[in-house]
Regions:
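Nucleotide-sugar donor-binding/catalytic module of glycosyltransferases
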Residues: 2-150
Length: 150
């Protein structure tokens, strides 16, 4: 049987941000996570990461031998997902914070709208002291999205 959702997180030298992201995942269903470390200066504390994850699900770790950049690390996560049997995949950057039940809302939307294959989210950008800086609001209608792409 297919597992429902895996979250991919590329990571480089932002351990506190990674913990913040892991701790912010609060859903009512099992979610696995794959973290690809992009050659950080110090090895991840896997035990602390696992103990910080309060949701149900497994955490998998991959390590690149040097810093190749977020694109390569994200693609390494995708390679892991392709070898597995997840129905859905989500992406977080280390430091991203999730609202409670964010993924359930997105999955419910996808399952009710089979013609749609990809969803995104708006974002609130916070400063280093978690103070609000600004919103990022991506377009939500097809024609606006097309204009942004080309």
């Amino acid at each position: 049987m297919d597992k429902r959702l895996i979250i991919t997180i590329p990571h480089y030298n932002n351990f506190e941000g990674l913990l913040t992201s892991i701790r912010s995942i609060r859903e009512q269903f099992e979610i696995d996570i794959v973290i690809t470390d992009d050659g950080s200066n110090s090895k991840l504390n896997e035990k602390l990461i696992i103990s910080s994850y309060k949701n149900q699900g497994k955490i998998f770790f991959q390590y690149l031998d040097k810093n190749y950049g977020v694109g390569i690390a994200a693609n390494k996560c995708l390679q892991f997902v392709k070898k597995s049997s997840y129905k859905y995949m989500a992406r977080l950057d280390a430091g991203d914070i999730c609202y409670e039940n964010k993924f359930m809302k997105q999955l419910n939307f996808l399952e009710a709208n089979h013609d749609i294959k990809l969803v995104g989210t708006w974002a609130r950008v916070l400063g280093s002291k978690r103070d609000f800086l600004f919103n990022i609001k991506h377009p939500t209608n097809y024609n606006q999205i097309k204009r942004k792409m080309y």
